Amino acid sequence: MFKYIFKGIPFLLLLIPNLVLAEKLTILHINDHHSHLEANSRMGLDLDGESTRTKSGGFPAVVTKIKELRSENPNSLTLHAGDATNGTLYFTLFEGEADAALMNVVCFDAFVVGNHEFNNGDQGLVTFLDYLNEGNCQTPVLGANVQPEVGISPLAKSSRDDYIQPYTIVERNGEKIGIIGIVISKKTKMSSNPDDNTMFLDEVSTAQKYTDELNSQGVDRVILLSHFGYENDLALAQKTSGIDIIVGGDSHSLLGDLSDLGLKPSGSYPTMVNDASGNDVCVVTAWEYSQIVGELHAEFDGQGNITSCMGTPHMMLADSFKRKNADGERVEIEEGYRDAVYSVIKVNPSLSIVEPDADAQALLAGYSSKIDEFSSKIIGSVSEDLCLERIPGQGKSKMCDPSKTAKNGSDISNIVAQAFREMSNLSDIAIQNGGGTRVDVAAGDYTLGDAYTLLPFNNTIVELSMTGQEIK
């Protein structure tokens, strides 16, 4: 009886051509690691109802998690949504070599250039991409709206696609998938340092143009690998048609059900919106600094439309958990409390204790030993904690209560601006953008490494003559 029923199912599918099994795709992704190759040793989480200090992420832990998820999903895509470089001494000293070496352990299926990839001009980006191309991965580098001048820019000595291409097409489970890359345009031109003749086109119209081009080639499963920011991605999705998934970066947005950990997510993982034609679009991004690996599972119908999206932002933790004792010192928690923390981690799908990949860790050690020697020199002392806030009272400082910055803004940013003014004998004022200073500064000895972590970008101080009316 049963064998005839099962024999009849393929025959039934032939009679009903529109009855097609859902196609599944898994995407693993990171973004904005900004040369943060080591673990964050100051991650604060609420675990079992108490504030707990742990270590999170680091690129060797990213490698471990991606290997684990790939073994569970053999046909997955692995994507990087930009700003791989700039932000720590790993870039300052090695100009992208260390980042490229660790990225080539993963072998990403595509990488979109971010705005900070242009901080050292087109030639600086070429240097990084040459390192990236030294390995066996040959990761496609995307940027559909990046227009280097052919014959002038080192990015385009012979053609516009010498280093950066608008999209790549991959195949998974017998289906072609187009991956388009875009980078935030105005911000890159205004706050980074691309060559003067390198242009950046409108993000929305560029994304639509290449989606249409892929569709005309019969590719109707389209991923936008976007370094445009979470809110911008949501808006872009609603203004365009034909994009199925947006894997984003730039805004350092944390997504997922993580508020119980004391974190402040910007939205759900994934976030679902409708495009201009009413079709579903999945939007994801994976926070910052090698601390989260996103795992997105999408399903398509026979026409290439999204029917389902679900996933998990994975935060990788070290097996180290500290809390303040009666003297205010952070110490490793005792066994009974540790078991309670383990129980919290076990039931939270976003948390896992991850051992760094040994090969990646050994590779990183070759660079970190040189950094340790350079950065350990003490150059001063700090008498009190100095808060970092881009917006007064925003509450993103990892060290200070928002009330401390609500009136006068970021302590350390103001001090940096004052230092710039004092360096110039002629200046009446100095302006420092809030995003140019990157970390809180703790009281105590201050090292050369601390200074580079605070001000990691190769910016140039310039003097301008302006009227008071011109300054806004």
Tell me what each language-model feature is.
Residues 1-9:
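Bacterial N-terminal signal peptides that target proteins for export
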Residues 11, 196, 460:
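Generic anion/oxyanion-binding catalytic loop in active/binding sites
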Residues 16-17:
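N-terminal signal peptide c-region/cleavage motif recognized by signal peptidases
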Residues 22-320, 411-419, 430, 465:
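Acidic, metal/ion-coordinating pockets
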Residues 25-28, 53-57, 70-73, 215-217, ...:
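Non-catalytic terminal accessory segments
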